[in-house]
Amino acid sequence: EIGVRLVGSEMCIRDRFIDLLRALNEVEGIERYRISSIEPNLLTDEIIAFCASSPKFQHHFHIPLQSGSDSVLARMRRRYTTEKFAERIEAVRRLMPDAFIGIDVIVGFPGETESDFRTTYEFLERLAPAYLHIFPFSERPGTPAVDFPDKVQPSVATRRVEELEELCRRLHGEFCARAEGTTDEVLFESTMRGGMMFGYTGNYRRVKAPYDRSRINTICRVRLGRMDDANDLEGEIVDN
């Protein structure tokens, strides 16, 4: 995993990022890349189309939302609205219908009302991402939010986290279950548990199969079977 921080105007960053993706696409010996975090206002149609056409860039996007309430986003000083965010998700799905979409969410931001939270919950439910990364708001010294009024009680923030975690479990299960009975390419990793090896499809569904050392760190064609309680799909290797 490599972290890249690009500095400059929004337009400059977008241009430099697509140039970086094109350069990485030409590197020999690396078969898979995943974009682990990209702001929605930087996820251009050009980047989406590039990832859809590249055999190396996997159909996986981790996009920070933080709140599904536009009033909360404004207080957070985010450069996008929920409408813009939803439009970017739709743009991804037009070209990559089965893309893994992970979303960051913060609950309990100062001033977040119960109505704001319900709006966020319903927005996420409509978007139906594959996964939610949920965080309770925590103050950071020196940031404007430290001085914001209307702090959310920790018990309220905890309850909101738990509600979104339950939503995440349901959405992730639905995403994984859609692959039952299909065939996909899986990169098996070195993890072994209970005689099984584990790996991931390009769009980040986790797959388990009987451990075979010769398959570790290789991409195998796998028939995907039943999903278990941990949302792991049973895999049967069908070729090399």
Segments (PLM) and residue ranges:
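Structural alpha-helical segments in enzyme catalytic/regulatory domains
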Residues: 50-51, 88
